């Protein structure tokens, strides 16, 4: 990997601000806010046991935030859902790639201390925004292979951009 440019770091800060505002409106408490040196960390205090169900819940939360906020330039890191991930030691240098004027090594730092503990109900609520595969039901005659979204959008002249990840496809109108 390489260090982020000043422009990329600024884009990460802007995205972090959007996510912060969204989660605050959603009911989340104030997080610890930090700059990793290459991006932004929003660390929410939650009291969850270290078990498979809670790991899945956190993974879905990050997938939801990725779906809602990631762009071509800035991505939500979806890999930090398990308790065994090592957290940045703030106050140390972020040494990624070569230290160049365009992509300098920076010192990570805490920008704001956290507010309170975020209740699990807000994590669960956030996960409801993640699309679920619809199951065929007798009442809805759902047959996924019969509907082609791209063909339908093209037929009606609706412009879109398609963003694909390993987990889903997002159509931005």
State each model region's role:
Residues 31, 40, 84-87, 108, ...:
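A broad, low-specificity signal marking well-ordered, structured residues that form hydrophobic/aromatic
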Residues 41-50, 75-102:
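Short, conserved secondary-structure transition motifs
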Residues 34-37, 81, 165-166:
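A short beta-turn/loop motif at secondary-structure boundaries
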Residues 101-146:
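Long, charge-rich alpha-helical interaction segments
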Residues 1-10, 85, 93-96, 106, ...:
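DNA replication initiation on ssDNA origins
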Residues 65-79:
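Conserved His + Asp/Glu catalytic blocks
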Residues 156-173:
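N-terminal single-stranded DNA-binding subdomain of primase/primase-helicase replication proteins
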Residues 1-38, 45-67, 132-149, 158-161:
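Signature for HUH/AEP ssDNA processing cores
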């Amino acid at each position: 990997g390489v260090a982020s440019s000043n422009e990329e770091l600024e884009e990460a800060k802007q995205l972090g601000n959007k996510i912060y505002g969204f989660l605050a409106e959603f009911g989340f408490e104030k997080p610890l806010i930090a700059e990793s040196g290459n991006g932004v960390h929003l660390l929410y205090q939650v009291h969850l046991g270290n078990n498979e169900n809670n790991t899945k819940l956190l993974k879905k939360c990050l997938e939801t935030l990725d779906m809602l906020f990631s762009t071509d330039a800035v991505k939500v890191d979806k890999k930090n859902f398990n308790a065994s991930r090592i957290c940045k030691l703030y106050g140390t240098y972020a040494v990624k790639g070569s230290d160049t004027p365009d992509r300098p090594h920076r010192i990570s730092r805490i920008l704001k201390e956290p507010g309170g503990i975020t209740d699990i109900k807000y994590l669960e609520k956030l996960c409801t925004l993640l699309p679920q595969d619809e199951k065929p039901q007798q009442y809805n005659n759902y047959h996924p292979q019969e509907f082609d979204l791209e063909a339908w959008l093209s037929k009606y002249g609706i412009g879109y951009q398609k963003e694909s990840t390993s987990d889903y496809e997002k159509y931005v109108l």
